[in-house]
C-alpha cells in the first residue's frame, strides 16, 4: 500500500499504558534479543525489546515469530496497535515487526535506506515513548 508521501502523521494516540510498561522494563529486557544490533550496522547504538519479527530469510513468505518481548509488552501494545490499524488501514494486512527501540545515550542513527524487500511492502508506525 503506497501512501504517496514519505511521512504521514496519524495524530495522537493513548500510549500511556504502553509507555509505563516500556519504561518499567529492567536492563535485561533490553538485552534479550540482539539480532538487530548484530545484523544491521545502523542499529549498533540501540537496544530493543522485540515483540514480533518476520523471518527475512524466508521472504517473501511471511513467517512472523513472537520474540522475547511478546510476553513483556503484548498486553498493552496490542490494543494500541489494533486501534491504529483499524482507524488508518484497510482490512487484510499483517504486522511483520513490532518492538520497542531505544537509542543509547550519545548514540546516533545515520541516515540510511533499509535494503530488505520487506521494507518496500510495509509501513512503519512510530510511537514516541520518551525523548
At which residue positions do the language-model features occur?
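Short, conserved beta-strand element in jelly-roll/cupin
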Residues: 102-104, 119-131
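Residue-identity detector for threonine
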Residues: 21, 46, 94, 110, ...
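A generic structural signal for short beta-strands and their flanking turns/coil linkers
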Residues: 94-96, 123
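Conserved short histidine dyad/triad with adjacent acidic residue
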Residues: 99-118
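General "foldedness" signal
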Residues: 32, 36, 112-117, 123-125
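Non-heme Fe(II)/2-oxoglutarate
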Residues: 1-91
